[in-house]
Amino acid sequence: MSGDLTRCLGKGSCPPGPVPEGVIRIYSMRFCPYSHRTRLVLKAKSIRHEIININLKNKPDWYYTKHPFGQVPVLENSQCQLIYESVIACEYLDDVFPGRKLFPYDPYERARQKMLLELFCKVPQLSKECLVALRCGRDCTDLKVALRQELCNLEEILEYQNTTFFGGDSISMIDYLVWPWFERLDVYGLADCVNHTPMLRLWISSMKQDPAVCALHIDKNIFLGFLNLYFQNNPCAFDFGLCGPIVR
């Protein structure tokens, strides 16, 4: 694996060369929760990969040949095949690469995890809206009430299942797909939103012990530094906390 701590490529940069045989490339951004999903799966399945970080405020022109809207993550293999949308990319990795399957083999259990993901679907947008409101000094009481309700819905799932993780007694795909937003609650200033959800707090504690989660954890001070620059529209935000030469 390479690229975890490489600087972002921006406008005017040269496109990277072909993807080497036996490696998959991910176009990513260190602080992006959607990229985080896919990187968790890459790490959990020990897939050989390289990371190309993209400056999302100053995107290279060539990157639009990888994704029509210039979003991350995007996977690219040595056959020049491109896969984007984070959930689709994660499922592709699970289907194509050997090792422990993160999605269940059983069709019903797989469908059930996708239904759980639908129950989660409002959390990313509500988290983002709360973050923006807090950073801009606006009242976010109603937004936090709405976010707490969505988290209560997830709490009820864990209570009903009486399991440590959303997919059962061991980590599976659904846990990795929702984790990035829970990791960000503290740095977003929203940690109190799980004060009323004891099962979710136990799940969070269990997730923090997972090797893939630990490997991709970003220090809170670095994340806060990124957010400070990001909300100043500073294109250097995406490289905050890195040192050394740009790797292209």
Curated annotation (Swiss-Prot):
Gene3D superfamilies in the cross-refs: 1.20.1050.10, Glutaredoxin
Biological processes per GO annotation: cellular response to arsenic-containing substance; glutathione metabolic process; L-ascorbic acid metabolic process; xenobiotic metabolic process
InterPro entries for the chain: Glutathione-S-Trfase_C-like, Glutathione-S-Trfase_C_sf, Glutathione_S-Trfase, Glutathione_S-Trfase_N, GST_C, GST_omega, GST_Omega/HSP26, Thioredoxin-like_sf
Residues the record marks as active site: C32 (nucleophile)
Annotated keywords: Oxidoreductase, Transferase
Span of domain GST N-terminal: 22-101
GO molecular function (one): oxidoreductase activity
Enzyme Commission numbers on file: 2.5.1.18, 1.8.5.1, 1.20.4.2
Binding site for glutathione: K59, V72, E85, S86
GO cellular component, as recorded: cytoplasm
Residue ranges constituting the GST C-terminal domain according to the UniProt record: 106-231
Superkingdom as given in the UniProt entry: Eukaryota
Xref: Pfam families: GST_C_3, GST_N_2
Family: Belongs to the GST superfamily. Omega family.
Function field: Exhibits glutathione-dependent thiol transferase activity. Has high dehydroascorbate reductase activity and may contribute to the recycling of ascorbic acid. Participates in the biotransformation of inorganic arsenic and reduces monomethylarsonic acid (MMA).
Name this polypeptide is given: Glutathione S-transferase omega-2
Classification of source organism: Eukaryota, Metazoa, Chordata, Craniata, Vertebrata
